[in-house]
């Protein structure tokens, strides 16, 4: 698949995520929600989903990485899709996706936060931003919510 395939995958996942919503989840619950939502999207698109997949080679920093999700189409056709789901702007996550793209995978980075992304995103990776709202309760718990149409 060409770069158009990468754009198509990103558009499709964004559209799926824009139909999702949740309220009052903890940070770990939000990450689990998005990981499960991506897995549901992938299954709906005909992909087999693997979680926590080790990259076959070390990154430039000589670290072996694990991708949050890796998708393989059930037909056996097309390229693998590698996905990272993060709240923060982790250079390590981006490095893993760059390596996956160098291996020929489509690379998607789902980042959930309202804070801006401060790293330059290479042309081989597509960033999907989920605009998650955060509030602090009287007990100082930080709870997160997502409304429909807040993923771009």
Per-region residue spans from a language model:
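Acidic-basic catalytic patches of nuclease active cores, encompassing PD-(D/E)XK
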Residues: 1-57
């Amino acid at each position: 698949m060409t770069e158009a395939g990468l754009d198509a995958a990103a558009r499709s996942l964004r559209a799926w995520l824009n139909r999702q919503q949740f309220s009052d989840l903890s940070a770990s619950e939000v990450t689990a929600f998005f990981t499960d939502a991506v897995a549901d999207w992938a299954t709906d698109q005909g992909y087999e989903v693997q979680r926590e997949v080790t990259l076959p080679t070390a990154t430039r920093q000589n670290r072996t990485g694990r991708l949050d999700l890796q998708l393989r189409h059930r037909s056996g056709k097309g390229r693998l899709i590698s996905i990272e789901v993060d709240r923060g702007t982790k250079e390590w996550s981006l490095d893993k996706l760059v390596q996956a793209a160098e291996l020929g995978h489509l690379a998607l980075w789902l980042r959930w936060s309202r804070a801006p992304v401060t790293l330059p995103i290479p042309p081989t990776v597509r960033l999907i931003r989920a605009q998650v709202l955060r509030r602090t309760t009287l007990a100082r718990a930080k709870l997160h919510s997502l409304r429909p149409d807040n993923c771009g």
